């Protein structure tokens, strides 16, 4: 049976530096949206489009800015950034199991591997020769940690994560199930129509405070390491090819695909389904909208798009038909321009006469 987590509103306020407007002793047992929250739950208003739900919300208390709290009759925690406060408080109510320190009897650990006594190694995990596991690391069941790979302190690997050999991971990195780090990059040389494999002799280096989603893959470098900077956040099912470099605090949504040797700057955001060709560079502070195909380097910060926005199917079919006619339309336009130029030239000559 699951025990109930409970905090007073005053305790939550102290955790995020909020001003309490209402009963500081009110018990809060969870978090929920404005529409779904009950009297024992805390909610938040971060997006103006949800403001319409605030007056009717049954939440015991709501995280609000000072401006929103002034017109609110209920109990509130007043903060500068409600969404950031919610993010901080969410960890207090996280029921993710915490593994006890130690190595499960079914795990296989190489004799020369180093596992900190405070680390946890789950059932049927494999830790190969020369690997080093830092303090407080949690390795889930059926994980594989390849030879000479390193996991920094406080790391968390869900079940079935695979690290190939020579992967270096910084502190406090979280990796979800199915992720594969350090697989061989897609490198081949063509000889008379036959593909000859290129050994991928680099590794992967990942910084601190990185999050890697389920079934995301990061290939090892062909020569030097594939590099993932500090604070990078990667969603599920992302493909990062060999020798890619990703700058600090860049975030990517699901199904992004990055071709080999691309370099992405710091504080960038790539929305779902974005694709990058290889050997290009993206500068810092770039936002790329969903389904965009980036085919050349981006040298100026800002927002970039190439995807086609949704429209009713009948309209889209008409637009697609027009696109197929563009070459013909361009030729006809050029002919009209030539005729117009000839008429204009003839008229000018007559005027001069």
From Swiss-Prot:
Name of the molecule in the record: UDP-3-O-acylglucosamine N-acyltransferase
InterPro entries listed in its UniProt record: Hexapep (IPR001451), Hexapep_transf_CS (IPR018357), LpxD (IPR007691), Trimer_LpxA-like_sf (IPR011004), UDP_GlcNAc_AcTrfase_non-rep (IPR020573)
GO CC aspect terms: membrane
Pfam family, one: LpxD
Protein's pathway: Bacterial outer membrane biogenesis; LPS lipid A biosynthesis
Subunit structure, as described in the record: Homotrimer.
Active site: 242 (proton acceptor)
A GO molecular function held by the record: N-acyltransferase activity
Function recorded in the entry: Catalyzes the N-acylation of UDP-3-O-acylglucosamine using 3-hydroxyacyl-ACP as the acyl donor. Is involved in the biosynthesis of lipid A, a phosphorylated glycolipid that anchors the lipopolysaccharide to the outer membrane of the cell.
PANTHER family membership: UDP-3-O-ACYLGLUCOSAMINE N-ACYLTRANSFERASE (PTHR43378), UDP-3-O-ACYLGLUCOSAMINE N-ACYLTRANSFERASE 1, MITOCHONDRIAL-RELATED (PTHR43378:SF2)
Family: Belongs to the transferase hexapeptide repeat family. LpxD subfamily.
GO terms of biological process kind: lipid A biosynthetic process
Catalytic activity: a UDP-3-O-[(3R)-3-hydroxyacyl]-alpha-D-glucosamine + a (3R)-hydroxyacyl-[ACP] = a UDP-2-N,3-O-bis[(3R)-3-hydroxyacyl]-alpha-D-glucosamine + holo-[ACP] + H(+)
Record organism: Pseudomonas aeruginosa (strain ATCC 15692 / DSM 22644 / CIP 104116 / JCM 14847 / LMG 12228 / 1C / PRS 101 / PAO1)
Keyword Acyltransferase carried by entry: yes
EC class (word): transferase
Enzyme Commission designation: 2.3.1.191
Annotated keywords: Acyltransferase, Lipid A biosynthesis, Lipid biosynthesis, Lipid metabolism, Repeat, Transferase
């Amino acid at each position: 049976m699951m025990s109930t987590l409970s905090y007073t509103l005053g305790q939550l306020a102290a955790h995020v530096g909020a001003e309490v407007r209402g009963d500081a002793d009110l018990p809060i047992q969870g978090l929920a949206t404005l529409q779904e929250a009950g009297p024992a739950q805390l909610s938040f208003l971060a997006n103006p489009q949800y403001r319409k739900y605030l007056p009717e919300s049954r939440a015991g208390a709501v995280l609000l800015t000072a401006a929103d709290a002034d017109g609110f009759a209920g109990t509130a925690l007043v903060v500068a950034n409600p969404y950031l406060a919610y993010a901080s408080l969410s960890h207090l109510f996280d029921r993710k199991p915490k593994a006890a320190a130690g190595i499960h009897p079914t795990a296989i650990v190489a004799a020369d591997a180093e596992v900190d006594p405070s680390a946890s190694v789950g059932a049927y995990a494999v830790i190969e020769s020369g690997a080093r596991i830092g303090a407080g690391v949690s390795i889930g069941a059926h994980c594989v940690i390849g030879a000479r790979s390193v996991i920094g302190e406080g790391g968390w690997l869900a079940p079935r994560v695979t690290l190939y050999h020579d992967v270096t991971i910084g502190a406090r990195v979280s990796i979800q199930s199915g992720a594969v780090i350090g697989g061989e990059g897609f490198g081949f040389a063509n000889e008379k129509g036959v593909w000859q494999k290129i050994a991928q002799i680099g590794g992967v280096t990942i910084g601190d405070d990185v999050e890697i989603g389920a079934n995301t893959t990061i290939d090892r470098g062909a020569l030097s390491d594939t590099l993932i900077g500090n604070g990078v956040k990667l969603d599920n099912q992302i493909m990062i090819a060999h020798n890619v470099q990703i700058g600090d605090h860049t975030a990517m949504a699901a199904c992004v695909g990055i071709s080999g040797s691309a370099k992405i700057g710091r504080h960038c955001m790539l929305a779902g389904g974005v694709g990058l060709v290889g050997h290009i560079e993206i500068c810092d502070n770039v936002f790329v909208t969903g389904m965009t195909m980036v085919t050349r380097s981006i040298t100026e910060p800002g927002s970039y798009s190439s995807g086609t926005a949704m429209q009713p199917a009948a309209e889209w079919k008409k637009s697609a038909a027009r696109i197929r006619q563009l070459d013909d339309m361009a030729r006809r336009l050029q002919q009209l321009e030539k005729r117009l130029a000839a008429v204009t030239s003839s008229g000018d000559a007559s005027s001069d006469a």
